[in-house]
Amino acid sequence: FTFNNGKDDYNFSYNRHNLYSQEYKVHPLYGKLGLPIDFSELTQKQPFFGQVQLSGGKEIFKKNFQNNISSPVDRSKIKLPPYLPNNPVLIEEYAKHYDAIQITDKRVGEIINGLKENKILNNTIVFFFSDHGMRITRNKQFLYDGGLHVPLIIADFTNQFKPILKGTSNSELVSGLDI
């Protein structure tokens, strides 16, 4: 069983039914969008591949953005990178970015809990990654660290592979194409 509940605006022509078992809807900007997955549809004995796309930094554009933040970032404690001017507009931009991370963290927890509640977590490997940095100069569309250094977390709940010490950080180069 395969599913993708996010956009799949790939740069090639394809038939979505050849890639995913799940139905989809058409979005005017992003092409095809998968429908939200109900983890109870998956069983312990059925292998699956799923892609769950989170809004990430784009949460700030949603009307209820502020309502979803449990503890807003203290703007007075934000330290901007040395190459940026200490400007209230930039501080607010960074604060909203950090606030959006809280929402992403909550959504990831909901996914993990959904897998756990449906007794399929122990048979799952979760890959968490981002496509680019935040939407600010020297990030997202630029070949600087802010646009290239994105999170990659692999959590093996199956315990089938060589364990890596919890909290281990690795700075080796990984290509998103490999994932």
Show where each model-derived region lies.
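Catalytic-site neighborhoods of secreted/periplasmic enzymes
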Residues: 1-62
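Active-site-proximal cap/lid insertion segments
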Residues: 39-176
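Catalytic core of tubulin tyrosine ligase-like
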Residues: 179
